[in-house]
Design a protein with these regions (language model features):
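Short, basic, helix/turn surface patches
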Residues: 10, 111, 148-149
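Conserved acetyl-CoA-binding loop-helix of GNAT-fold acetyltransferases
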Residues: 98-112
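Feature representing long, continuous alpha-helical segments
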Residues: 47, 104-108, 130
Length: 149
């Protein structure tokens, strides 16, 4: 990618003034990347994402990464930063740029940033998507615990 095109990966600051514009761009990429993600993006779920962005940005725990190629946003992902761990929450990319593996590279560059910042763990959270294993993930047991009286 570096040798073939002009690209940039960066984190955006989420504020009350910037949240709508940045999250709409994230939602666009998320919806483009799969029909399931597009269907998931109801008004209620979008409002939830915006609320998360504002709440966790206030404590610098929310990271919204965008990748641009020639000035156009082509991939994005959200990570939470918590107690020395980056937690990959959700992502999206433009499938027209899939030949450049922009979705995978967007995530790989967040791992690179985590290493640069001396983050101790990068957690892909639930799911067995193939890209997670391409980036070095290993399975962990995840348990649901229900406590009742």
């Amino acid at each position: 990618l570096e040798s073939n095109t002009d690209f940039e990966q960066y984190t955006v600051q989420i504020t009350q003034n910037s949240v709508e514009k940045n999250m709409e761009e994230f939602f666009r990429l998320m919806a483009l990347s799969s029909d399931d993600k597009g269907a998931f993006l109801t008004v209620q779920n979008k409002e939830f994402f915006v609320d998360l962005a504002l709440r966790f940005s206030a404590t610098d725990q929310y990271k919204l990464f965008f990748m641009e190629i020639e000035g156009a946003k082509v991939a994005a992902c959200i990570c939470f930063s918590y107690e020395g761990t980056y937690l990959l929450y959700n992502s999206g990319y433009d499938p027209e740029k899939s030949s450049l593996s922009v979705g995978l590279l967007n995530k790989a560059l967040t791992i690179q940033e985590a290493i640069r910042l001396d983050v101790k763990e990068y957690n892909f959270l639930r799911g067995t998507e193939r890209y997670k294993y391409h980036l070095g993930a290993s399975d962990r047991a995840v348990f649901d615990l229900v406590v009742s009286r």
